[in-house]
Amino acid sequence: MTRQIDFAGQSGVLYRYKALEEMRPVPPGGANFVYVKWDGDAPKIVYAGETDSLHRSVFETWDEAQSGYGATEIFARLNITGVVRRAEHDDIVAQHQPPMNTGGESLAGRRKTGRTGG
């Protein structure tokens, strides 16, 4: 059974993310991804990223997310079109205010697209 989670954006749109462990090998294409920690049964996003190459970017800040923010899982959603990825990213960040995204980003994913603001 595929592990999926729906995350709502600030707009009210639901985005369905799939557990990265079920996407092996990690796809090379564009995607949105989130690092998650669990609060009981509720997933909490600690970082939201978007990239034009999931396999190249998704693990760049994973160690920091685990050690500094308690992240335990990665979920991803494949999105080929950059404008769609960026809009989804902004919607998710606006709703969930992930701690690794607030106060300015210097992290993976967004750096790959040349976007540095949150």
Task: Please tell me what each predicted stretch does.
Residues 1-57, 83-95, 111-118:
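GIY-YIG nuclease catalytic motif and its immediate N-terminal context
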Residues 27, 61-65, 109:
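N-proximal short alpha-helices
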Residues 58-61, 66-99:
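Short, compact, well-ordered microdomains
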Residues 98-109:
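Coupling/hinge elements of helicase-like and P-loop NTPase modules
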